């Protein structure tokens, strides 16, 4: 059963074929974040649903590894976008996936541009990391209360 769970988490993203990853135009919701992660790869977006102290909903404490730092910086990026009047989890933006590369735009407003850049940075950041199973389903109680400050 654990092996099946790991294959689902670390295998190809659900609902995204190789052709979809190569060339497709998306509109955003939270599912679009998953699309950008799947476009760049190498793991399923599900692999980050509950990882470390920052990947998934919420976040606090000291990031545990490079993946967790990517998610922390993404949270900071979403906070900056929210401060600029955007709704990161609801606002939509146009983008394309071309040969595993994210192409943002054409943006109709600043929020679309900001949010696509946040998701793009996360996707490329995660692509260069090593995955540590010990941080999958990491108990949030083990994350400290104090968080690093966003830049």
Curated annotation (Swiss-Prot):
Subcellular location: Secreted; Lysosome; Cytoplasmic vesicle, Secretory vesicle, Acrosome
Disulfide bridge map: 39-97, 53-143, 55-71, 70-125, 76-150, 77-118, 86-111, 104-116
Main location: secreted
Free-text cofactor note: Binds 1 Ca(2+) ion per subunit.
GO terms under biological process: arachidonate secretion; axon guidance; cellular response to leukemia inhibitory factor; cholesterol homeostasis; defense response to virus; erythrocyte maturation; fertilization; hair follicle morphogenesis
Entry keyword Plastid: no
Binding residues annotated for Ca(2+), in chain numbering: 54, 56, 58, 75
EC top class named in words: hydrolase
Domain of life: Eukaryota
Outcome of mutating residue 74 to Q: Impaired acrosome reaction
Catalytic activity: a 1,2-diacyl-sn-glycero-3-phosphocholine + H2O = a 1-acyl-sn-glycero-3-phosphocholine + a fatty acid + H(+); 1-hexadecanoyl-2-(9Z-octadecenoyl)-sn-glycero-3-phosphocholine + H2O = 1-hexadecanoyl-sn-glycero-3-phosphocholine + (9Z)-octadecenoate + H(+); 1-octadecanoyl-2-(5Z,8Z,11Z,14Z-eicosatetraenoyl)-sn-glycero-3-phosphocholine + H2O = 1-octadecanoyl-sn-glycero-3-phosphocholine + (5Z,8Z,11Z,14Z)-eicosatetraenoate + H(+); 1,2-dihexadecanoyl-sn-glycero-3-phosphocholine + H2O = 1-hexadecanoyl-sn-glycero-3-phosphocholine + hexadecanoate + H(+)
Entry function: Secretory calcium-dependent phospholipase A2 that primarily targets extracellular phospholipids. Hydrolyzes the ester bond of the fatty acyl group attached at sn-2 position of phospholipids with preference for phosphatidylcholines and phosphatidylglycerols over phosphatidylethanolamines. Preferentially releases sn-2 omega-6 and omega-3 polyunsaturated fatty acyl (PUFA) chains over saturated fatty acyls. Contributes to phospholipid remodeling of very low-density lipoprotein (VLDL), low-density lipoprotein (LDL) and high-density lipoprotein (HDL) particles.
UniProt name for this protein: Group 10 secretory phospholipase A2
Source organism of this protein record: Mus musculus (Mouse)
């Amino acid at each position: 059963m654990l092996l099946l769970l790991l294959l689902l988490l670390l295998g190809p993203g659900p609902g995204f074929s190789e052709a979809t990853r190569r060339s497709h135009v998306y509109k955003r919701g939270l599912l679009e974040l998953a699309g950008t992660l799947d476009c760049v790869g190498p793991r399923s977006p599900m692999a980050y649903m509950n990882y470390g102290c920052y990947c998934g909903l919420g976040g606090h404490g000291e990031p545990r590894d490079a993946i967790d730092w990517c998610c922390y910086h993404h949270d900071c990026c979403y906070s900056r976008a929210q401060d600029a009047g955007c709704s990161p989890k609801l606002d939509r933006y146009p983008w394309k996936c071309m040969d595993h590369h994210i192409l943002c735009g054409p943006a109709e407003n600043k929020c679309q541009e900001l949010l696509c850049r946040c998701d793009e940075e996360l996707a490329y950041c995660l692509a260069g990391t090593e995955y540590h199973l010990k941080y999958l389903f990491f108990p949030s109680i083990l994350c400290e209360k104090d968080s690093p400050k966003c830049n």
